[in-house]
Amino acid sequence: MEEWYGQVAPREKLLKYGAAVLTDAELLAIFLRTGIPGMHVMQMAEYLIEEFGSLYGLISADYQALCAQKGIGVSKYSQIQAIAELAGRCFSSHLMQESVLQNPEITQKFLQNILSHREREIFLVMFLDNQHRVIRHEEMFTGTISSVEIHPREIVREALKVNAAALILAHNHPSGKAEPSQADRLMTTQVIKACSLLDIRVLDHLVVGRGECVSFAERGWL
């Protein structure tokens, strides 16, 4: 079996054990394919993830920040952006084909992929049809590292624009801890009241942390 960097090559490891056992750096190394003089591709992958703080930090970095790294040019930047876009489209297409209530795990993974590593609080709304399939999702409000101000009327206006019958609310906690605050619960109540005037249901509010997601519906708070 081929070895890289003193260990089993990521591609060989993937073929033998499956992609799920690979680390973030190993998966990235498969996409990058080659390193640079003096730095093996595995070392390069590990360095990039460490430099940007996380895999999400890496794939969401802009062109200037990424290309400032030695060995990263247009080609590797394009590869990294393609990874991010493919992942997003995969989740989106899956969500749009079935009711989100039938597969809550996919919904939570989708939201974690988008929100879990953001440095500011982001309030996202998923707009659903009458069969609870996703019409579209939108990051509606951006806050600070510890709070986000929302406007229920804007959410209702957007829901009417796309003819949504129901919503799923979501926001992240940059601290990494997903436990909802009293402010989160009050915010949810305000949105529910505004939506109920037009018979739009709020099915859930998900608070996203790092590696965890808390559902208001599962806690019986709606």
Swiss-Prot record:
Swiss-Prot/TrEMBL GO biological process terms: proteolysis
One MF annotation (Gene Ontology) recorded for this entry: metallopeptidase activity
Protein name: UPF0758 protein YE0063
Gene3D superfamilies: Cytidine Deaminase, domain 2
Disulfide bonds: none
Any Pfam family the entry gives: RadC
Domain MPN: 100-222
UniProt-annotated binding residues for Zn(2+): 171, 173, 184
PANTHER family cross-referenced by the UniProt entry: DNA REPAIR PROTEIN RADC, UPF0758 PROTEIN YEES-RELATED
Motif JAMM motif in this chain: 171-184
Keyword Nucleotidyltransferase appears in the UniProt entry: no
Entry's family note: Belongs to the UPF0758 family. YicR subfamily.
